[in-house]
Amino acid sequence: MHDVSLYLLELLENSVRAGAGHINVGLRIDHASDEFQMTVDDDGQGLNAAPEQVLDPFFTTKEGKKTGLGLSLLRAEAEAAGGGLSIGPSPTLGGAQVHVTMRLSHVDRPPLGDLATTLVVTAVTNLDVEFTISLEGDEFGQALVEAPIAEAAELLQRSMERLA
């Protein structure tokens, strides 16, 4: 994959396929600590395999597929950019949680891509799913912003333009 927004799309699609009725997306951009964080929590069916299996590129639970490259590629990208990936049960919603960290200034950090459009398109094509977006960091003008999808996407789009 070429940018973080495509990984976010994959995570959101996984949540929807797992039957999530509520998905929390947390994005944190902190220049002081040189860190980007992305968390996706859902109330879907949770992990149907051990986290080690889910991160194996040759394991998938998707019918008709032979590999499950998305999470393993995301983990490799995160580690290459001085961060990591953790996956497990969601402590707040009871489904699954994926948490990704990367150093913002790392030369190997993939571009963030169009995170705002990814969030909006996913939300409008899955109207039966409730999305909560949390934006944190100096890019967003406040310590923490929780907003409806359209408002959060607009704020996110403006901040991504400044990062470009």
Model-derived segments and their meaning:
Residues 2, 6-7, 13-115, 133-138:
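Conserved beta-strand-loop-beta-strand hairpin that lines the nucleotide-binding pocket
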